[in-house]
Regions:
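Polar/charged, compositionally biased leader and regulatory segments
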Residues: 2-6, 15-75
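Acidic, glycine-rich catalytic/binding loops that coordinate metals and/or anionic ligands
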Residues: 21-27, 31-34, 141-142, 148-150, ...
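Short glycine/threonine/proline-enriched tight-turn/helix- or strand-capping micro-motif at secondary-structure
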Residues: 46-53, 69-100
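Short coil/loop residues immediately preceding or within conserved phosphate-binding loops
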Residues: 63, 86-88, 96, 102, ...
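A residue-level detector for short acidic-glycine micro-motifs
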Residues: 70, 93, 109, 134-137, ...
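Zn2+-dependent peptidoglycan hydrolase active-site motif and core
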Residues: 84-86, 101-139
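Short hydrophobic beta/alpha edge segments that flank linear recognition/processing sites
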Residues: 91, 119-122, 147-161
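A structural signal for short beta-strand/turn segments enriched in small hydrophobics and glycine
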Residues: 99, 105-107, 143-155
């Protein structure tokens, strides 16, 4: 329930919604969502109040099966063995698995990034940016507009990496936030 509350709070109070008082909408959503399994009805209520979901990272960047190999937050770095903040999630996946844009946006970086190897960064509306790193191949160019679900690259192990995976980050108003809170939405609820 806490995760749903965080997502709903972000959606209702920081994104422009239309036609309904925000406090009333929040009450309706929280009454509908009894626990985390009730995300589909919650998304339905919010979707009725604006076309924001195209621009909010709300699907997994990988459609193939993956394993979360490292979480958002402090961790012991797997290579230099020091405690460091990990600003995204690492999703272990097969080599060259397709990587998808998690929201509509514009490519602002498509190239090498120190430590991250081949990386794509997308700027979305409402202060969101997403980063996709350690790619084996980039399938987009700077300045290109992409839609939610479009293929932007293929997973790999470039940069400082211990194996094939995707490092995925979400930034909201220049603050890195936990991507798992957004990845729980699936394509049927968007």
């Amino acid at each position: 329930m806490c995760r749903i509350f965080n997502i709903v709070f972000l959606m209702v109070f920081t994104l422009p919604m239309f036609g309904q008082d925000k406090a009333e909408l929040m009450a309706q959503v929280l009454q509908t969502a009894k626990d985390y399994r009730d995300i589909a009805p919650v998304m339905g209520i919010i979707k009725q109040n604006g076309q924001v979901f195209k621009y909010v990272p709300s699907i997994s960047p990988l459609m193939e099966r993956y394993r979360i190999s490292d979480y958002f937050g402090y961790r012991i770095h797997p290579i230099n063995k020091t405690k460091q903040f990990h600003s995204g999630v690492d999703l272990a996946v097969t080599y060259a698995a397709t990587v998808h844009a998690t929201a509509d946006g514009k490519i602002i970086l498509a190239g090498n990034m120190a430590g991250y190897g081949k990386t794509v960064v997308i700027r979305h509306k409402y202060g969101f940016k997403t980063q996709y790193s350690h790619l084996t191949y980039i399938y987009c160019t700077v300045g290109q507009e992409v839609g939610k679900g479009c293929v932007i690259g293929f997973a790999g192990s470039t940069g400082i990496s211990t194996g094939n995976h995707l490092h995925y980050e979400i930034v909201k108003n220049n603050k890195k936030i936990n991507p798992l809170n957004f990845m729980l939405w699936n394509s049927e609820t968007n």
